[in-house]
């Protein structure tokens, strides 16, 4: 189904909107919901698109239009058969008597034989979906007029040509007859018997009129009291089996028009001649063969119940009916191309009541591609097929919970969600997650959410998830966890860590992942994730990425809401929780120090003869003072002996060991640099004075240098600086 992007979007949206309406009604617990309305809406959507494409005037849309029309027919078939199969058929047992009319016996058979009734339903469906050409303009208004005028026919008796071989029918009469009978045949296949009768009357074809009047079995409300309230007068004809054989004998008359013979074959429950059958399609061929099954089984039942007199059995007719499976196989062999169409394969499975197995086969096809067993197949190459099968699985599970394997339904829905993601139809995705179990729902939703960055799209996702009553909190938690898991390998360095001042896409992906918790107002979880994010960034030298996160989010507000949420949820006060807030505060101080460091670097790079030296010196002194204070306090309390047994102690100590030496050495370098640029020697002395801080046994900062492997580098730096002071 090749469609423009507009059409594709509309159809995806139409199907998802239908499911959304169902869920809304279900969640609101309104009046009893008819799940079959979903199928009816699907049929309507497919039918409307078929009509739109057909009316578009674009020849390239012809195939797409036919495919959508075929899909509309499919949903119609699903509706008809599933309604019947799931109906409460606890009907009163009909008691029959030998004197009842044969029509009542037929009614009893259809009531008891569910398989036969379903064949009748399929035939009704085929009739309703049979295309009948427009009424031909040259349908004759009288019989044999040209032959009588030319003298080739000596009698106006309509059956005279059959009884007298010497008559010569005019060629034009034969042509008009062919047009008429072909039209009548199409009307009969479409179930338009009344219309066919009217056409026969208008064309003066009394024989066809009389024959069509014998279609119905005899019913008499006088003796058939069981259905007396359904009829006022008798209907149908007696000795219907005799009528059937008489009509059948006419179908064997080689001298008749092929379509006239085909009419008689169909009415008698036989297969039409090859001259007509060669022009049949999958649907009409199926119709003809199902008609044969129906008529054969009905007469067999009547024979078993002694409702057919021996005087009616003037000709032998087939008494063995094919099975529906055999019929479908035969039709498939005659129409291989049509029968291989994926939608017709689904139609056949609906008729055979084997939809769950077909759904499972579709899943196997998906897995074959994933495993690499197949490069492609219909379910992958034809997205419309995935859409149909997915929605079919959803409908079946709604109507008959458990009728579709949970794993099959899940794989179809999650694959379809991936298709929607490729189409950029994010708003349509959450509704499908509602039909998954909670575990699969979390995985499917988190898979999608973890890839979203646009603020408006993210906001809409949360709104929709909440509106559909999905487990929003767990979905957002799983999304954040998924992003942490996905990026873990990127933050497992094998070489020496260096402080970097760039922000890459992976950093942003992790930031977006944590922000789901903030946007979802899950502040307790958000604080825990901010801790995890900060540690991951800092342990890998991604200090600028942490700065980016803190610039994007109001950390103070998050911490306040964190405290309020704990109170509201009656979460007991925990020493570790207080430690988390303190840890975040420490990271804020670090980021502030990094900003000052970068600002000083910028000031130095812009230094010129026009620079305000006093202001610059003041700025350096402020930077030096703040950095010195940060060096002395950064994570000191959280890595004190009081927390030595804490599970987080080693992590925090490692972060401190990475950044404290970095800050101290960079401050040292900047003071030395400033001393040279500004010609102020005392800055060198200030830099060298840091050695006492490093060697101080109270602060034990030298241990941080040892731990980070920076001690030798620092001592070399001090030695070089010392030569400058001499």
Curated annotation (Swiss-Prot):
Gene3D superfamilies (alphabetical): 1.10.3450.20, 1.20.190.50
UniProt-annotated location(s): Nucleus, Nuclear pore complex; Nucleus membrane
GO molecular function, one term: structural constituent of nuclear pore
GO biological process, any: telomere tethering at nuclear periphery
GO CC terms of this entry: chromosome, telomeric region; nuclear envelope; nuclear membrane; nuclear pore; nuclear pore outer ring
Membrane topology category: Peripheral membrane protein
Coiled coil: 563-583
Alphabetical UniProt keywords: Coiled coil, Membrane, mRNA transport, Nuclear pore complex, Nucleus, Protein transport, Translocation, Transport
Residue ranges crossing the lipid bilayer per the database entry: none
Family under the similarity heading: Belongs to the Nup84/Nup107 nucleoporin family.
Oligomeric and partner information: Component of the nuclear pore complex (NPC). NPC constitutes the exclusive means of nucleocytoplasmic transport. NPCs allow the passive diffusion of ions and small molecules and the active, nuclear transport receptor-mediated bidirectional transport of macromolecules such as proteins, RNAs, ribonucleoparticles (RNPs), and ribosomal subunits across the nuclear envelope. Due to its 8-fold rotational symmetry, all subunits are present with 8 copies or multiples thereof.
Protein function: Functions as a component of the nuclear pore complex (NPC). NPC components, collectively referred to as nucleoporins (NUPs), can play the role of both NPC structural components and of docking or interaction partners for transiently associated nuclear transport factors. NUP84 is involved in nuclear poly(A)+ RNA export, in NPC assembly and distribution, as well as in nuclear envelope organization.
Misc. remarks from the entry: Present with 8580 molecules/cell in log phase SD medium.
Protein name per Swiss-Prot or TrEMBL: Nucleoporin NUP84
Gene field: NUP84
